Regions:
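Long, charge-rich, low-complexity alpha-helical segments
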Residues: 41-99
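Acidic, low-complexity/disordered tracts enriched in E/D and polar residues
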Residues: 1-54, 98-99
Length: 99
C-alpha cells in the first residue's frame, strides 16, 4: 500500500491530525491570512483552510475539530468538506496523523 493511501485510510472521525513535519502554520499579518511555511517556501491558505489547520494539533480528533468549527461558525454538516480538505492536505504532507 502506498504512503498516500495509508494516510488516507487513517483519516476518520477518530484520527488526530497534526501539521506535518517540516511545516509551520502561522498568521501572516502582511497577507491577512494563515500561511504554511516550509524550507522551500510558503503556502498562503484561504480562510477555511486556515481555520481547519489551526485546530489540527495532534490532540483533537477529526470529529472534535468538525464540532468546534460548526460551533464557531454556527454551521452544520461540515464533516464532508473538512474531511475532503484534510485528505488533500495529507497528500501534500501538510498534515499527518498522530497516534
Amino acid at each position: 500500500m502506498t504512503e498516500e493511501r495509508r494516510r488516507e485510510g487513517e483519516l476518520g472521525a477518530a484520527a488526530r491530525p497534526a501539521i506535518g513535519r517540516g511545516f509551520r502554520l502561522q498568521w501572516e499579518a502582511a497577507q491577512q491570512a494563515h500561511v504554511l511555511l516550509y524550507p522551500e517556501g510558503m503556502v498562503k491558505l484561504n480562510g477555511s483552510a486556515g481555520e481547519i489547520l489551526k485546530r489540527c494539533d495532534g490532540q483533537r480528533t477529526v470529529a472534535e475539530i468538525v464540532t468546534d468549527l460548526e460551533t464557531a461558525f454556527g454551521a452544520s454538516g461540515l464533516t464532508n468538506d473538512v474531511m475532503a480538505f484534510m485528505a488533500i492536505a495529507l497528500t501534500k504532507n501538510w498534515l499527518e496523523i498522530r497516534e
